[in-house]
Design a protein with these regions (language model features):
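C-terminal helix-rich "cap/oligomerization" subdomain common to oxidoreductases
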Residues: 9-12, 58, 231-273
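Beta-loop-alpha module in the N-terminal Rossmann-like domain of NAD(P)-dependent dehydrogenases
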Residues: 1-50
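Rossmann-fold dehydrogenase core element
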Residues: 48-65, 83-89
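A general structural signal for well-ordered alpha-helical segments in protein cores
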Residues: 19, 23, 46, 72, ...
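Active-site loop of classical SDR/Rossmann-like NAD(P)-dependent oxidoreductases
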Residues: 195, 215-226, 242
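Contiguous beta-strand/loop segments that form the cofactor/metal-binding neighborhood of enzyme cores
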Residues: 120-200, 225-236, 273
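Predominantly a Rossmann-like dinucleotide-binding segment in NAD(P)-dependent oxidoreductases
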Residues: 66-148, 264
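A short helix->loop->beta-strand "cap" motif at the edges of active sites that frequently abuts
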Residues: 29-31, 56-58, 165-166
Length: 273
């Protein structure tokens, strides 16, 4: 279909393990591509997509929508000139149990579906991650109406930031009857801020003795798409909120977390990819 269809742009929403083939084919045509996160299931596939994007004239965006928060700039300014010492993020709530979501090989489960959003936001606020520790609960939190799948319902990550700080990310898939909880808190020497995420999207806290407060004026998903469309129309790739080169860095942290889950060890991010 991609070879013959008269399309203006492509939005790849396949399971992550099936991202590479359509993404690379479309980039080779030189036409705009919006690629749902994560960029791919494996670092090899992600590297191939990044290479295709680098060699293409096409605009390419990856759907880490929290990057598109209009109050993310306010949060960064509150932390400007400071080193983040502690970051804590939580993404807990129900989600649609698509068959590939329950298949770790196809989708990566909670770690990629939810955790990579938090990893990406942590990188945006606290800088690059050099090593990861991880643990998963054996408790089933979300009911299954079909196959149980092979994913972990609850995962906790410890991120070691290049600048010296630590981050903790808690991710869990729960019953849809329970309230969701999505937020991140960041502490630096002269700042303590909180970003409430879905569904409120607001910033609060203190920076250098002054209160910090802001409310998002647009939903980040809508803003991410709007920025992509503007980039595609103008041919200005810098307008996209998350480019492939940034998305693969988030995937590298998630891949290290997967290795940490399997080994029980602290895994350097640099040893993967």
């Amino acid at each position: 279909m991609l070879g013959t269809a008269d399309l203006d742009l492509l939005w790849v929403c396949t399971p992550p393990a099936a991202h590479a083939e359509p993404a690379i084919a479309w980039l080779d045509r030189g036409l705009p591509l919006y690629l749902e996160k994560p960029i791919a299931r494996s670092l090899d596939d992600a590297s191939a997509i990044v290479a295709a994007a680098a060699g293409s004239r096409a605009v390419c965006a990856v759907g880490y929508q929290w990057r598109a928060l209009d109050i993310l700039g306010d949060a960064r300014r509150a932390l400007a000139g400071q080193t983040v010492g502690c970051l804590v993020g939580q993404s807990v709530g129900g989600t649609q149990a698509r068959s590939w979501f329950l298949d770790n090989a196809a989708g990566g489960g909670n770690l990629l579906e939810r955790g990579s959003h938090q990893i990406d936001l942590a990188r945006a606020l606290a800088g690059e991650v050099t090593a990861v520790q991880a643990a998963a609960a054996s408790v089933r939190l979300a009911p299954r109406t079909g196959p149980a799948g092979d994913i972990d319902d609850a995962v906790t990550l410890v991120l070691h930031f290049e600048a010296g700080g630590l981050g903790t990310i808690v991710v869990a898939w729960t019953s849809a009857a329970l309230p969701g909880s999505y937020w991140v808190e960041v502490t630096a020497p002269d700042a303590a801020i909180r970003l409430d995420l879905d569904p409120h999207f607001r910033l609060s806290g203190v920076s250098n003795g002054a209160p910090v407060a802001a409310v998002a004026q647009a939903r980040p998903f809508d803003r991410s798409v709007d920025r992509f469309v503007a980039a595609a129309r103008s041919g200005a790739p810098d307008l996209v909120c998350c480019a492939p080169g940034d998305a693969i860095a988030t995937l590298a942290v998630a891949a290290a977390a997967e290795e940490a889950l399997a080994s029980g060890q602290t895994v350097p991010v640099s040893c993967l990819g």
